[in-house]
């Protein structure tokens, strides 16, 4: 073994660093949910977003099929695209009650089809919230069932040129899926290119480091990111020094992440002041993420 090889073997840190992903050129693509901008009508919201350089819009999934034409007309000629679709389905996928599961199946497929018409990156879904019951038990059999169901949804989404996006939550909101790495593993085991996952800066702060969580999904599965302040889930920046996203942004840069980072948060103060400030904070920290 040569001198360089011996040095590498004697330094686990050096070995880890040498295996770290190399940064790929990418830009911060910010998305707003419909309620983020301090405006009333959709046209006013889109005008405001364009002034700030926001390039994505994340609508709610409820009644989305009825709004496809509205969004298509409103976005015509603009540099804004539909990013992900925020849930909006009825029921839930791990419901023990067959009628609740049937509600999920039909409503989710309606949203997926509409998302495809809009060119969306995917429809966000949570397998089960803590308050939803009766729910299938947290067992390997349930995981196998979930992977089978996700495969079917993923293949359906591919037919509509979109995806389904698993969202891990924190333990206060969900007992089943809390780690981005676990969501990525379900994507893998679902064996469908239409099954993806996402990270949420609010939920990740309760469960693991931003950097490790986002890297664990990798370029193959990471399809969307949510952002909010880290103490109260308000506008980024409202919680002062707590609102540090640099490590997570560094991971996104290293992955060459080319999808959206979308606001999912409330606001305690004047949106006219706090929304532009939040956007500037994100852009500043993106540049700091070296």
Tell me what each language-model feature is:
Residues 66-78, 107-119, 147-155, 210-217, ...:
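Short amphipathic alpha-helices and their capping/turn segments at secondary-structure boundaries
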Residues 49, 57, 75, 104, ...:
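Conserved, mostly hydrophobic/aromatic
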């Amino acid at each position: 073994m040569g001198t360089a090889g011996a040095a590498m073997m004697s330094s686990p840190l050096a070995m880890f660093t040498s295996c770290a992903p190399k940064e790929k050129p990418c830009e911060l693509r910010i998305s707003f949910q419909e309620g983020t901008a301090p405006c009333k009508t959709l046209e006013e919201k889109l005008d405001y977003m364009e002034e700030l350089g926001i390039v994505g819009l994340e609508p709610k999934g409820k009644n989305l099929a009825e709004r496809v034409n509205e969004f298509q007309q409103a976005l015509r000629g603009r540099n804004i695209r539909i990013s992900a679709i925020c849930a909006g389905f009825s029921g839930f996928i791990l419901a023990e009650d067959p009628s609740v599961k049937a509600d999920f199946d039909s409503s989710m497929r309606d949203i997926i089809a509409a998302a495809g018409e809009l060119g969306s990156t995917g429809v966000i879904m949570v397998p089960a919230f803590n308050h939803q019951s009766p729910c299938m038990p947290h067992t390997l059999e349930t995981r196998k069932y979930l992977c089978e169901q996700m495969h079917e949804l993923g293949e359906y989404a591919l037919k509509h040129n979109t995806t389904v996006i698993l969202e891990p939550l924190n333990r206060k909101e969900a007992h089943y899926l809390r780690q981005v790495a676990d969501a990525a593993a379900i994507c893998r085991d679902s064996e469908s290119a239409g099954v993806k996952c996402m990270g949420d800066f609010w939920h990740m702060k309760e469960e693991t480091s931003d950097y490790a969580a986002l890297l664990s999904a990798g370029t193959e599965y990471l399809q969307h990111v949510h952002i909010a302040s880290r103490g109260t889930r308000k506008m980024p920046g409202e919680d002062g020094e707590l609102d540090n996203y640099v490590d997570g942004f560094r991971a996104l840069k290293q992955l060459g992440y080319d999808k959206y980072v979308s606001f999912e948060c409330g606001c305690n103060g004047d949106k006219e002041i706090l929304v532009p400030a939040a956007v500037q904070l994100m852009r500043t920290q993106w540049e700091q993420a070296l």
